[in-house]
Regions:
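Extracellular beta-strand/beta-solenoid scaffold signature
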Residues: 62-70, 90-98, 113-116, 120, ...
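Acidic Gly/Asp/Thr-rich repetitive segments characteristic of extracellular carbohydrate-active
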Residues: 15-42
Length: 438
C-alpha cells in the first residue's frame, strides 16, 4: 500500500505540473490565472499576454535545470508568487524569471534558490516592482552540477556557492525604459546589473550582502533615486556611461580591503546629488571622468573620502560635506587642477577647517587646501597609514593651508563652507518665500 501511495503522489504531482502549463497554453490573451497556495512544478513558458497571480503560499518551483518561468510574450504580469529552483549554468543564463517580451510586469514576488533572479534580454518597458530576491548560496544534491572549473576536484566539495559563481539579482542586457522600484536583493553576485541599457529608473531599492550593489556598464541616461547599497564588497560601480542622475542614494558600510561606496570610471556628463556616502573603505572614486556635477553629497566616516585617479577634469564640486574621513582626498599624485571646487562662489564643507566668516554669509573667508602627501606611499606600504594623524603631518597640513607648498599634491577650494552655511541658506529661503507671499 505504501508503494501505491507513493506512485499516486508522483502521478498527482506530474498532473499538477501539466495542469499549470496547460492552463497557460489554453488561456485567452489578457486572461488572469489565479494560482492556489501550494507548489506548482515548473518550468513553464508564457507565449501570450496573460496575468499569473498567486494566492498567499503559491509557488512555482523549477526542477533545478534551465529557467523556472520563461516569458516570451509582451504584456505579461507575474504577481504574488514564490519562484524558485532554476538551473545553475552561468553559460546558459539560467534564471528564476527569464524575459524576452516587452512591457513585462513583475511585482510582489519572492525569488529564491536560483542563479539569476530576473534576467531581461533585449526588452523595453519592463516594470520590476516590490520583489524580494534571495541568491542561491549553497549547492544541494538535487540540483544539477555547476560547471566545473578546470582542475577542480569533485571530491570533498564545499557546498558553499561563492559569489562569483552566483547570478545577479536583476540582470539587464540591451534593454530600454525599465522601471525597477522597491525591490530587496541579497546574497546574489551583483544586485542590479546594467549592460547597454538606457532610459531606465531605479528607485527605492535595498541591496545588501552582494558583490557589487549596482554593476553598470555602457548604459546612458538612467536615473537612480533613493536606493540603499549597504554591506557589499562595493556599493556601486558605474563605468563607461553618460547622462546619469544619481540622487538621494545611500552607499554605506561597504567594507573590505578594496571596498568602495561608489566608483565612477570613464563616465561623463552626469549628476551626483544629495547622496550619503558613509563608512566605506573608499567613499567616492573618480577615474577618467569628465564634466560631472557633484552637489550636496555627504561624504563621511570613510577611510578615504574621495579618490582621484588619472585624467579626470571638468568635474564641478559644490555644497558637499567631507566629514570625519581619515583621508579626505587621495590623488595618488594625479593632476586634479582642472576640476572646480566652488561654483558661483559656493564651495564645500571640510570639517578640518578653521572657520573665519567675518561677513556672516556662511562662506569661509580663507581657502581650503586639502593636502595628499602620502597616498602613493600608502598604496605600496599600507603601514604608512599609521602616520595619518601624526603631529608632523598635522603641522604640514596647517602650513599648506596658509601658503601653497610647491611639489605637494593638493586641491584648493576657494570658497569653503562654514557649519552655518545651510542654516543661513534656509533662513534666506524662508524670507524669500514670505516676501513672495506678500
Amino acid at each position: 500500500m505504501r508503494i501505491i501511495g507513493i506512485v499516486l503522489l508522483c502521478l498527482a504531482t506530474s498532473a499538477m505540473a501539466a495542469t499549470l502549463q496547460e492552463q497557460i497554453d489554453s488561456a485567452a490573451p489578457n486572461d488572469t490565472i489565479h494560482l492556489e497556495a501550494g507548489v506548482h512544478p515548473g518550468p513553464v513558458v508564457i507565449s501570450k499576454p496573460i496575468k499569473l497571480v498567486g494566492e498567499s503560499g503559491a509557488e512555482i518551483r523549477g526542477n533545478g535545470s534551465g529557467n523556472v518561468v520563461t516569458i516570451k510574450a509582451d504584456d505579461v504580469t507575474l504577481s504574488g508568487l514564490r519562484i524558485s529552483a532554476s538551473g545553475l549554468r552561468l553559460s546558459d543564463d539560467d534564471a528564476a524569471i527569464f524575459i524576452t517580451g516587452n512591457r513585462a510586469r513583475i511585482e510582489h514576488n519572492v525569488i529564491a534558490d536560483s542563479l539569476h533572479g530576473i534576467y531581461l534580454k533585449k526588452v523595453s518597458g519592463a516594470q520590476i516592482l516590490h520583489n524580494r530576491i534571495e541568491g542561491k548560496t549553497t549547492l544541494s544534491v538535487s540540483t544539477e552540477p555547476v560547471e566545473k572549473t578546470i582542475g577542480q576536484s569533485t571530491e570533498n566539495c564545499d557546498t558553499t556557492l561563492v559569489s562569483n559563481r552566483r547570478g545577479n539579482g536583476i540582470h539587464q542586457w540591451n534593454c530600454d525604459g525599465s522601471t525597477i522600484v522597491g525591490n530587496e536583493i541579497t546574497e546574489t553576485r551583483d544586485g542590479i546589473y546594467f549592460s547597454f541599457t538606457n532610459n531606465s529608473r531605479v528607485e527605492d531599492n535595498l541591496i545588501h550582502h552582494v558583490r557589487y550593489g549596482l554593476h553598470y556598464m555602457y548604459s546612458d541616461n538612467n536615473v537612480f533615486l533613493n536606493n540603499t547599497f549597504a554591506e557589499n564588497a562595493a556599493g556601486a560601480a558605474i563605468m563607461f556611461s553618460k547622462g546619469l542622475v544619481v540622487r538621494g542614494n545611500r552607499f554605506i558600510n561597504n567594507r573590505g580591503h578594496r571596498a568602495y561606496g561608489l566608483i565612477f570610471q570613464s563616465s561623463d556628463g552626469s549628476k551626483l546629488e544629495q547622496n550619503e556616502i558613509s563608512a566605506n573603505a573608499v567613499g567616492l572614486s573618480f577615474n577618467q571622468c569628465n564634466d560631472n556635477e557633484i552637489t550636496g553629497n555627504r561624504v563621511t566616516q570613510n577611510y578615504i573620502g574621495l579618490r582621484f585617479g588619472s585624467n579626470s577634469s571638468g568635474n564641478r564640486f559644490t555644497e558637499n560635506s567631507f566629514m570625519r574621513n581619515l583621508h579626505p582626498i587621495e590623488t595618488g599624485g594625479s593632476d586634479v587642477s582642472e576640476n572646480r571646487w566652488a561654483i558661483n562662489g559656493v564651495g564645500n564643507f571640510w570639517d578640518t577647517d578653521l572657520e573665519v566668516d567675518l561677513d556672516h554669509n556662511g562662506i569661509n573667508d580663507l581657502p581650503h587646501r586639502e593636502l595628499d602627501s602620502l597616498s602613493v606611499l600608502r598604496r605600496d606600504f599600507p603601514v604608512i597609514a599609521f602616520l595619518s594623524e601624526s603631529p608632523a603631518l598635522k603641522l604640514l597640513r596647517f602650513a599648506n593651508e596658509r601658503a601653497v607648498i610647491p611639489g605637494l599634491s593638493a586641491i584648493e577650494d576657494p570658497a569653503p563652507l562654514t557649519s552655518r552655511f545651510w542654516k543661513i541658506q534656509a533662513q534666506r529661503s524662508a524670507r524669500a518665500a514670505v516676501a513672495k507671499g506678500k
